[in-house]
């Protein structure tokens, strides 16, 4: 009886070992498959590295620009804007921002968002519906779904693009009749405004329609229906001189908006810190110019330290006295070799597979802070007193308390020109996108 019992025990042990080995192989296979899928997903969606495991941003920790683009998942916009409209917005971008995407401090406008919409529908009416002139009116329908509730209209412009054949040295007086379809039932006469310009010097015609569209945009109207008649008279010639403007494409609608959300950059809040005179009262011959405080603190501080070091070395000469060595010893506590400072990190939006959306800038340098924080940090880094207290606690009382970390202390905004999913073009200024100063906290 002992032999069969031992045999049964051996069979059970062998079966149990086989079961455990199959479980371990299955777990390793699933782990490798999940790791491979995670690698594929991270390659396909670079922003997935910024999200939790389930891919949702519950805490709202994503930077505003990254959050906007992460919702699009790298898809190509379904509609592409007209090339002339895109060219106009690129020129606008160069006027407002530098090549690196930083908003120019010389600008004085209050809007931080500009949206260009192309008409989603265009229909030419019959001649019986004309308001004035020999040309029929053109119906234009603009879809404003991309305008958010936090974006307030400051100015609206109807943009016409002129053909190259329209160049002329003659003075042309243009009359434009605009009718908002929703307002025709009230029986009011269509607004009319004269514009005088020389075609040779203009590629675009901008017609201010703020007074017409302000009530509609304020009331969150998502669809604007306009009827437009655009005729011009050359050299003030009477009726036989009236001709049609050679327009290459239907007009676009441009909205200049003030985005009041927290993710947008509000330039009027930093005007005092951006501009300041360099001369004191009573001084003459010194011109006032814009001064960027962040640039001064970031760029001049290292140079000043290097200059002071050179002066001290020249004064001391080749003699290495004990006092000089002692000063060098104490200086390593105040200015460590691997001190906390800004570092560049230049990347291209094509590396993140966001170049389908972002037209400008092509490259982005967010910069980052790296290095050791010295013991005396308040004067140089603008750190609070708490940082010094934390340093003392770490050194004297409890080493488990972390030392102050080298982190960004100030940021600058980033101007971005993007193509929206509906084919519209948007210029936006995002807050806190480029580190400009480091601090220890």
UniProtKB/Swiss-Prot annotation:
Belongs to the TGF-beta family. It holds the Pfam family TGF_beta. Residues 30-306 form a propeptide. Required for ovarian folliculogenesis. One of its GO terms (cellular component) is cytoplasm. Ovarian physiology and fertility are controlled by endocrine and paracrine signals. These act in a species-dependent manner and determine the ovulation quota in different mammalian species. While humans, and mammals such as the cow or red deer, normally ovulate only one egg per cycle, other mammals such as mouse and pig can ovulate in excess of ten per cycle. The mechanisms that regulate the species-specific differences in the number of follicles that go onto ovulate during each reproductive cycle are poorly understood. Residues 1-29 form the signal peptide. One of its GO terms (biological process) is oocyte growth. This is Growth/differentiation factor 9. Ovary. Strongly expressed in germinal vesicle (GV) stage oocytes, MII-stage oocytes and in zygotes. GO terms for molecular function: cytokine activity; growth factor activity. Phosphorylated; phosphorylation is critical for GDF9 function. It comes from the Eukaryota. PROSITE patterns: TGF_BETA_1, TGF_BETA_2. Keywords: Cleavage on pair of basic residues, Cytokine, Disulfide bond, Glycoprotein, Growth factor, Phosphoprotein, Secreted, Signal. It is found in: Secreted. Glycans are attached at residues 163, 229, 258, 325. Disulfide bonds join 340-406, 369-438, 373-440. Homodimer or heterodimer (Potential). But, in contrast to other members of this family, cannot be disulfide-linked. Coiled coil: none annotated.
């Amino acid at each position: 009886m002992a032999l069969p019992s031992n045999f049964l025990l051996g069979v059970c042990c062998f079966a149990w070992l086989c079961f455990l080995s199959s479980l371990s192989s299955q777990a390793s296979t699933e782990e490798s498959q999940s790791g491979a899928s995670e690698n594929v997903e991270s390659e396909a969606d670079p922003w997935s590295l910024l999200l939790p495991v389930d891919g949702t941003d519950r805490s709202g920790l994503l930077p505003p620009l990254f959050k906007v683009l992460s919702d699009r998942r790298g898809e190509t916009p379904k509609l592409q804007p007209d090339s002339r409209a895109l060219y106009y917005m690129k020129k606008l971008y160069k006027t407002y921002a530098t090549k690196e995407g930083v908003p120019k401090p010389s600008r004085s406008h209050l809007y931080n968002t500009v949206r260009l919409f192309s008409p989603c529908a265009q229909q030419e009416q019959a001649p019986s519906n004309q308001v004035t002139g020999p040309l029929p009116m053109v119906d234009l329908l603009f879809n404003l779904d991309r305008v958010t509730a936090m974006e307030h209209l400051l100015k609206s412009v109807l943009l016409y693009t002129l053909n190259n054949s329209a160049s002329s040295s003659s003075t042309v007086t243009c009359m434009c009749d605009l009718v908002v379809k929703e307002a025709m039932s009230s029986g009011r006469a269509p607004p009319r405004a004269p514009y005088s310009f020389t075609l040779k010097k203009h590629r675009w015609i901008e017609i201010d329609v703020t007074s017409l569209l302000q009530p509609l945009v304020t009331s969150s109207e998502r669809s604007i229906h306009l009827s437009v008649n655009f005729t011009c008279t050359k050299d003030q010639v009477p009726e036989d001189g009236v001709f049609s403007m050679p327009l290459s494409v239907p007009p676009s609608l441009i909205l200049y908006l003030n985005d009041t959300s927290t993710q947008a950059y509000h330039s009027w809040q930093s005007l005092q810190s951006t501009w300041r005179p360099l001369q004191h009262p009573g001084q003459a011959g010194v011109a006032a110019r814009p001064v960027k405080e962040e640039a001064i603190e970031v760029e001049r501080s290292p140079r000043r330290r290097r200059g002071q070091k050179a002066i001290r070395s020249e004064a001391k000469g080749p003699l290495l006295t004990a006092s000089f060595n002692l000063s060098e010893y104490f200086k390593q506590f105040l200015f460590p070799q691997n001190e906390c400072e800004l570092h560049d990190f230049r990347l291209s939006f094509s590396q993140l597979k966001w170049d389908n959306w972002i037209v400008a800038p092509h490259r982005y340098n967010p910069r980052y802070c790296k290095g050791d924080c010295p013991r005396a940090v308040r004067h140089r880094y603008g750190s609070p007193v708490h940082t010094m207290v934390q340093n003392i606690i770490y050194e004297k009382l409890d080493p488990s308390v972390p030392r102050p970390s080298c982190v960004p202390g100030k940021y600058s905004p980033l101007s971005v020109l993007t193509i929206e999913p509906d084919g519209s073009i948007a210029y936006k200024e995002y807050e806190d996108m480029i580190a400009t100063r480091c601090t220890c906290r």
